[in-house]
């Protein structure tokens, strides 16, 4: 898998170029590259990495969601996926795990960059898990639960204060954090109290199952006639506070 980060593909003033034409040029380039790979008989795929800004003032296709939509317009979308990066999505204030889940569900999670980041700031590339350990846990748990087998790439760097030994501490820290969170994810999945609570939270009485699946006019008609007691529904707490605290505990 070859990763593309289009850090050059952006603008500081939207009067400098037509944004739609810029997307078309990106599409033409990716189509050309895919055809070249096929013509040469290479066993190669591409992963597109999104970033909202830096070094350009604004970068086209700034998030993983934008990239997923763009990929579906290509001539060979099966050859192109995404490489989500923690820091880049957090720069845009987005829930990273949700973007990863969307990419995975679409069959487009070809690669992933792990680091950490304060939201809304320049690209910091902090040690994985060093800022938001809970978000890092959610991510690791998702990757392990779905059986992701691709690369786990630590696109990060040590604090500017570190010497050579500090850089080695940083590298070991990235790997250690992932492995610790992997172990904690297994512990979460095996915890009887947590699993009992999840079963209660997600319990389904089957009352809506008749509406599942494909559309039909009969289903739509019945759904519009389905009574809902809003007071009864809203009176039952969902116990998310307890679940969240058990996760921390």
Regions found by a protein language model. Name each.
Residues 1-81, 203-213, 230-249:
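Active-site acidic/histidine proton-transfer and metal-coordination neighborhood
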Residues 3-6, 48-52, 82-88, 113-116, ...:
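A cross-domain feature marking catalytic cores of carbohydrate-active enzymes
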Residues 8, 25-27, 56, 121, ...:
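Arginine residue identity/basic-tract feature
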Residues 9, 36-38, 52, 74, ...:
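Generic hydrophobic/packing signal
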Residues 17-20, 57-68, 78-81, 88-149, ...:
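Gly/Pro-rich active-site loop or hairpin
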Residues 26-31, 136-137, 175:
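Short, hydrophobic/amphipathic alpha-helical packing segments
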Residues 146, 152, 209-213:
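Short non-domain terminal segments
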Residues 164-249:
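C-terminal extensions of enzymes
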């Amino acid at each position: 898998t070859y990763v593309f980060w289009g850090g050059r593909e952006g603008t500081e003033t939207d009067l400098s170029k037509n944004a739609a034409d810029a997307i078309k040029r990106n599409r033409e380039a990716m189509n050309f590259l895919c055809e070249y790979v096929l013509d040469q008989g290479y066993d190669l795929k591409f992963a597109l990495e999104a970033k909202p800004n830096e070094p350009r003032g604004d970068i086209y296709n700034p998030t993983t969601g934008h990239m997923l939509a763009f990929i579906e317009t290509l001539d060979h979308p099966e050859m192109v996926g995404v490489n989500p990066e923690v820091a880049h999505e957090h720069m845009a204030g987005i829930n990273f795990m949700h973007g990863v889940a969307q990419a995975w569900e679409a069959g487009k999670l070809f690669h992933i960059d792990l680091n950490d980041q304060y939201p809304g700031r320049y690209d910091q590339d902090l040690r994985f898990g060093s800022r938001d350990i809970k978000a890092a846990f959610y991510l690791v748990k998702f990757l392990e639960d779905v059986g992701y087998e691709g690369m786990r790439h630590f696109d990060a760097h040590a604090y500017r204060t570190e010497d050579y030994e500090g850089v080695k501490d940083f590298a070991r820290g990235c790997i250690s954090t992932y492995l610790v969170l992997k172990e904690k994810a297994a512990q979460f999945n095996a915890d009887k109290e947590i699993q009992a609570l999840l079963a209660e939270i997600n319990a389904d009485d089957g009352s809506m199952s008749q509406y599942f699946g494909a559309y039909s006019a009969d289903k739509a008609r019945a759904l519009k006639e389905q009574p809902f007691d809003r007071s009864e529904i809203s009176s039952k707490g969902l116990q998310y506070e307890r679940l969240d605290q058990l996760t921390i505990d």
